[in-house]
């Protein structure tokens, strides 16, 4: 594992310049200078990202490297959340990852929308872990999936006596010290992507916005709702497709950081136009195809990025 460093400003050079300035004025200034304050400034950026400095991580958000699919695991103190469960391949990657994290129970499981690249291994998750709450967005009957992966998930839920709680915008609840807001879907649309659950999770002063595969029509619904979208970290919608992450939407979210769950395939995602939009707002963009699994640690104020590659 390694930590990414921000490159906007050379804080080492700042320390050197202050030293030189102190010598020029008076050597005694070195003794009286507040070095603790300077060092603290040198390791923490304006957006709260900590560079190679340990923090008391009350919350860790894991964006799994699952190719052009989605799976996010969150642990916050003694609470555990799973958002989506990748595609069918590579087999068992989600369950095995959760087992390595010593997960026994999931307090919340979220299906952003029932496309195969989001629910591919959900049946295995349901079979292998105790689940307290399972939520999804209701979709119109005319676009309800009929393919095997979705039907298998429903059968597995039934076998384990688990019920789906269907949610829409406006629902707010807490799991431990995490505040969760469902921002979408608001209206029904004629494609599964724009019926995705859009969810904001806040821990202390740090917030994460998860958008599933929400496209521009759903983004506009959420903008028009007047909800506060501003978030520290954005999980970029639809793997960086040009139909998502509209400029209007990003201007409301104003993310300091973006994470794109994507793999190498002929779709050539993320699209350049989306990266250009994101660069207008983000200090850094992280991609699972470049960095592998990405883990964000936070104490509710500062954040630290850990990457697999």
Please state what every model-predicted region is.
Residues 2-309:
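Non-globular, low-confidence helical/coil segments that flank catalytic cores
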